[in-house]
């Protein structure tokens, strides 16, 4: 009882010290104002537009949206791309992380490897899509002028999947690199001393220890993929995802309420993935 009371007094003292610091108070106020203005307020408007009509609170907007064939198709398209990109990005990120941690690279080659690994992160989100079109499109530098292929179509499902994988795998790479570095090397050394090959050590020791991290990496890239707008808009062609469907619902159909309802569906999928990550993987 005394220990609990002491902790409460200590926490109260810390709060008073915090509130006595004008710089810290100003920082907190600015952060709260920023979150309210740019996150909470738009989210509130989104919910109001999707649940309220002239007749008051209603689910009619969602019923109307769910009845749209293009919306149901875009949900299926988004989930298919998201799962594939999540799997491919996780595998590619694992490969890059494994090479950096376990393979001894030279100073120059190691530096070049890190630059190549992180290049998609520092590039604008649409650069890889444009590069794919310019290099492998019907008039692409590689397909048309080097390989003499004149009918190559980079648009659609596979175009989105490839570009998003190249865009988001560095996120998995950074997550898994830190995870591999934190694995106790004595566990792997013990397996090697017992005669296990490098592959068997990875399969029986390293990989099981990485499973929660792999799950986190998959969910993060899955969320990034389904929320991505720039790449599907540029290289998606007629393959619509939720993000592009929401955009076209506003700009093409001038249906603000319908777009808001679609955005709530997308937000719900994202929050569900965050919940899975929070309660099952952490």
What is each residue range found by the language model?
Residues 1-20:
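Short, Lys/Arg-rich, polar N-terminal cytosolic tail immediately upstream
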Residues 54-55, 134, 228-253:
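Glycine-rich helix-loop "coupling/hinge" segments at transmembrane-helix boundaries
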Residues 21-55, 67-181, 209-229, 259-278:
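Membrane-water interface segments at the C-terminal ends of transmembrane alpha-helices
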Residues 13-15, 276-282:
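Alpha-helical transmembrane segments of integral membrane proteins
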Residues 14-15, 57-66:
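A short amphipathic helical element positioned immediately N-terminal to and/or at the very start
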Residues 194-195, 208:
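Glycine/proline-centered hinge or cleavage motifs at structural transition points of membrane proteins
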